[in-house]
Amino acid sequence: MINLGSAEIADLRVGASQVARVYLGEDIIWQPNFDSLPAAIYFSAAGYDDTGAGTQAAPFKTLKMANAVARAGKTLYFRGGDTFTGTLLARPGCIYNSYGTGKATINSGNAESVLLDNADSAQVRRLIAQGSGTTVNGTHGIRAINSHAEGIQIDDVVIDGCEVRGYGRNGIFATVANYPSGLTGLQITNNIVEDCTQNDERGHTGGIIVAAEEADFWGLATHPASHRDVVVTGNTVRRCKGKRDAPNHVGSGIIVAQTEGGLVENNLAEDCGENSTNQAGPVGIWAWDAIGVVIRKNTVLRQRSARSDGGGFDLDGGCKNCVLEYNFSMGCTGPGIIIFSFDDTAYPANKLLDYSGNIARYNLSVRDGQTVRSEFGMFIGTMRPVASDFQNIRVYNNTIVVDTVGAFSPTCLSIQTFGGVDFSHATGVIANNIFLQKGAGLLCDVRTTAMQIHSNCFHSVQGTAMRSFGFDWETVDQWISASGNKEFLHGTHTIFVDNPQLVNDSGTNPEDFRPADDSPLYGVGMDINAEFGIARPTEDFLGNALPATQVFFTPGAMEPDTPLPNLLTSPNVLNTGWELNDIDLISGLLGMFGGTSAQNIRVDAEGAAVGQLRTFTAGTEKIFRRGGFVKPAADVIAAVIGNRQPDINDYWWTWFDIVAGELDDADAWGAYLDSVPRFRMQKRPNGFWLIMHEMKVPSTWTQDKFWAQPSAPHPLRGGINEGLGRGLIHDGFFEFRVG
């Protein structure tokens, strides 16, 4: 192409004679018909640049010709199975694709395969980029760059369906030469990147990277994001191992940084990072210095690092309102999930946005943390000494399963700081997760009193310790007290410590880590929207719908296929199967979700209650979880649930203050004295509370009675006594067998 200023030359003459062709060396760079070529221009290894017409019947031959004839609106087709040598220089508004059988290969040797420099709306599709080798080539495979002056954006670049192999730096790299110029609407989709990143002395390498040049243009606290609304979906990254002794992280799968708004979805990264030796290690798929990036439904397998990091997924320093959800990692040397804010104050000033509003939910990590420097299933922490950092972090409904692998026994959950940073300013919620420790490592290591930690399943198969601020505790009560009342809310423990009974906790398929249909986990999770105002998504890890009117909540990334059956007769309406003792009135009222299913129970006589006789087969001990959904009316401030053994009149009852919102008292007689292992009280919508306790039925019993009643203050002890209140609204009772 020949330009006069910014305009392309359409006609070139010497005197009165039109120039037929212009060469640069032996390469044709212009001829008069270039502007009149058809919309589809074809290239083949069997074609001719001199005599070709750019048609499928008479194609051109070389990439140099392609670089010369490209005009906005043209589609350039390269014959599948053919190899073209050199570098393709993508032009704005052009589409580059293969035709025929298979994909065309661009063999770029030691150079880049495709360069999209200020290539607005250019599309590169279904091409193979082949470099001279990951330890020989020193460039990127496909590079999209905005080299405009400050503030100009390049829109709608597409890199789709390509295969990239044998490049020493990044496989696919989207970057800028000046900030805040960048790429808007970039799409990197359905590509395969293999065997790259092993010849870059500087580090910061990965299979696919969307970022500014990190040495100069990072830090969204100091300038706008370079990139906006980026889409990275359906890609596969393999064996991007990095270069040993590089001064920074090398060998990540996918990185998105210096970006506002983005989706990273349905990608696979495996066997990357093996050569990483720097303290700042790689991660399979991660974001940093980013706003509103969503990383979802991706898989990372066997991510490696010889030192730190080496994990599956990471929201790192400077992330704001970013999301990790529905991701699966397995067999990584570092944590499956990393929530971390690094120290930018040494560069030399704060360049990062405060780490805030980030979410990790419905992710699955299996047997990660297989190295001494990053021996964790999930890691949450900071080394940034900024009091406004690490705010409103939400980590919920993840499943983290660790085991001893070789010499490594990772801690299932670690929450800590580095460099003496005070973590007391951190805020956030860690709830409804499963932390399953199968090996010899710690169950958890928590070094903060600031974050809310509730309704998680912590279970160690080998009975390993729970650590708090460097001290190991053998009992849950000790750990809860030492850790600042973690897992203690509304006067009751919220922790669940029994085996979650997953389908196959030694498996490799994500579905193996779903709670079995008879798992005791069912219903012990909290309603995080009612408790903390956290909006829940519409599906779990496996795509099962999470109804907006859900009543029972289960920890972990997956719902059971089948809920535990409610064993009560007529659990929502007090008629068939219920005994109504001295009940003055039962009437329908507004339920939890705006319906009219709730009933108002009014009583006048002391001891008035509703009850249901339960019968079962003797011979084995049984554990039942019993409770209901209640809220106060009239002069009621409490609800009582209990059990009676009719033959010998042994009983257990539990009082819940449903005005103050806390467990008030419990009492027992006879065989029930040691039979109730746990209580639970949780918020529900519209002022309702879930109240429940678990109780053991001795093997000799064939019946007992579940009962519930309203209650009012006792005038003598200032507490609560049974059967003196009028007006308890209930929206259903339940009984589950959990053992």
Please report, for each region that a protein language model flagged, where it lies by residue.
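Acidic Gly/Asp/Thr-rich repetitive segments characteristic of extracellular carbohydrate-active
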Residues: 45-79, 83, 479, 519, ...
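Right-handed parallel beta-helix/beta-spiral solenoid domain characteristic of secreted/periplasmic
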Residues: 46-51, 58-60, 77, 84-85, ...
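Parallel beta-helix/beta-solenoid
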Residues: 95-100, 112-167, 185-194, 228-238, ...
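C-terminal accessory segments
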Residues: 478-562
